A protein has these predicted regions:
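Bacterial N-terminal signal peptides
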Residues: 9-21
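N-terminal secretory signal peptides that target proteins for export/translocation
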Residues: 1-5
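Histidine-/acidic-rich catalytic cores in large beta-rich domains
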Residues: 27-304
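Sec/Tat signal peptide C-region and signal peptidase I cleavage site
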Residues: 22-26
């Protein structure tokens, strides 16, 4: 019959083995990898090992890897008025729309086949154009005109058919109907760059030189906020692009960060940094698209 001492020894040994077995997978799970598209002073795709697998010779502001493998890019000041191009992996241009004002700063491929873009200039506007270049939607934007460059950034078409537009110098994010009527807006503490409408109806906003990210509810109340005050490492350095991942984490750019500095970082809801990206390029990352996590492709509509 087992003695009390032998039973205690068996239980202790079992507990130690269980602890070792359970901690090993946790350590392995802690390692996060991503592949992603980068837009900015340099344009490229990085794999999970940090190697460049594709690049484009021009600077860009916004971009998407499309389901067909092509890349949609915004060339801010190309052709004098900016442009949007879709290119194949070997650099062939299969679509181009040339802007008519000062800059084109954002673009989005829509489910109906159209391309949405914004023009900055004396008459700031949001457009939808067909693949043959015909303008089918023209939304005038109520934005300041003193500084064309600081009018708008990452505008996105929403599932309800409206458009969410961050207006930098105006310090406001507005939701426009196709007829130009503003149906929702929220003032921001600093220049808003990225505004992402989440599935729960909240809106995630990166505030560039304010070095903070906020999430607001439908009433415009802040329900989540992170800034350099939350991190000893002070990772925020011009929070431009952002993306909410399926696991609830948020990836944020540090656009002013140059070579050797943290250019992207991923934070959890409870404000833990779980992944960072650094490279030796001088150019900062303006925006990005996370393509996969630990080899698994991001499914559904990218929240960026």
């Amino acid at each position: 019959m087992p003695t009390r001492r032998s039973i205690f020894a068996w239980m202790t040994c079992t507990a130690i083995i269980t602890l070792i077995a359970s901690s090993a997978p946790a350590d392995e799970a802690a390692k996060i990898t991503h592949s992603f598209l980068v837009t900015g002073g340099e344009t490229f795709i990085v794999d999970a090992e940090g190697k460049t697998t594709w690049s484009y010779p021009k600077s860009t502001r916004d971009g998407w890897v499309l389901p067909n493998g092509n890349i949609l890019l915004t060339l801010s000041k190309a052709n004098d008025g900016g442009s949007v191009v879709e290119v194949t992996r070997d650099g062939k241009v299969v679509f181009e729309f040339k802007g008519t004002q000062s800059e084109v700063n954002t673009a989005q491929a829509l489910e109906n086949g159209n391309i949405m873009l914004t023009e900055a200039g004396a008459k700031p506007r949001l457009l939808e154009v067909t693949r043959d270049g015909k303008i089918v939607v023209d939304v005038p934007l109520q934005a300041q005109t003193k500084d064309h460059h600081l009018q708008t950034r990452m505008a996105r078409k929403l599932a309800n058919g409206n458009y969410l537009v961050p207006q930098l110098l105006d310090k406001v994010v507005r939701e426009y109907q196709p007829d130009g009527k503003i149906v929702w807006e929220v003032a921001t503490p600093n220049w808003p760059f990225t505004a992402i409408r989440l599935d729960n109806g909240n809106t995630l906003i990166n505030c560039t030189i304010g070095n903070l990210t906020i999430e607001v509810d439908k009433q415009g109340e802040t329900v989540w906020k992170i800034s350099n005050d939350d991190f000893p490492s002070k990772p925020f350095d011009d929070a431009c692009g952002g993306q909410r991942l399926p696991n609830g984490n948020t990836v944020i750019t540090a656009y002013h960060a140059s070579s050797g500095k943290t250019k992207l970082f991923e934070v959890t809801r409870d404000k833990q940094i779980v992944w960072t990206y650094t490279d030796q390029r001088k150019a900062g990352i303006h925006h990005f698209q996370i393509l996969d996590t630990n080899g698994k492709a991001i499914e559904g509509r990218p929240l960026r």
